[in-house]
Amino acid sequence: MSFDTLDYLSPDAFEVRISELLVATSEGADALIDPSVSEVLRLVKDHLKMDVVFVSEFVDGRRVFRRVETRPGAAVIAEGGSSSLEEGFCQRVVDGRMPRLVHDVEALPNKAELPPTDFPIGAHMSTPIVLTDGRVYGTFCCFSFSANETLTERDLKKLEMCAQLAARKIDAQRAREFEQASANWRLV
């Protein structure tokens, strides 16, 4: 099944492709987050009809956008960009101050406590990326500019599965980097 011919309306096709990517290995990838995660972002964006999908890493009190996919004309964040953790929704999801699935951000009872954004956020879904050692790497997030009442708990489960894929890929890359550094250290 190729990326171009995938029927995004079919939940089964989406889940099958994510499962394929979960078991795939990235031989020799030199980026911390390998290309299969970018493909997953595109799948999520199209399948859930979101405007923006990204993987963020939490670094020194900041949220760094490591991979980003957007619909045409929706490039409101960029790979490599960052902001304070308190300026976004990610940290709030991780620590439980905000639900993982929000159909309409404007309708949240605690909307006044949320940080202002430079662009509208209607529907929002986010889940932590938890590494094998238990540390939270960051989050796997997506949002649309408009509210979306059609999102379901099953959609959130799909996002959680994608976060597991990202965690697996990050863990594998870190293990390769550690192995390489250890080999270099022994050679010196």
Locate each region found by the language model.
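Amphipathic alpha-helical regulatory segments at dimerization interfaces
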Residues: 26, 38-47, 92, 96, ...
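Regulatory sensory and allosteric helical modules in signal-transduction proteins
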Residues: 58, 62-63, 74-114, 122
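Helix-to-coil/beta transition segments that act as allosteric "coupling" elements at the rims
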Residues: 113-137
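Short regulatory/linker helices and ligand/cofactor-binding micro-motifs at input modules
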Residues: 2, 8, 17-35, 186-188
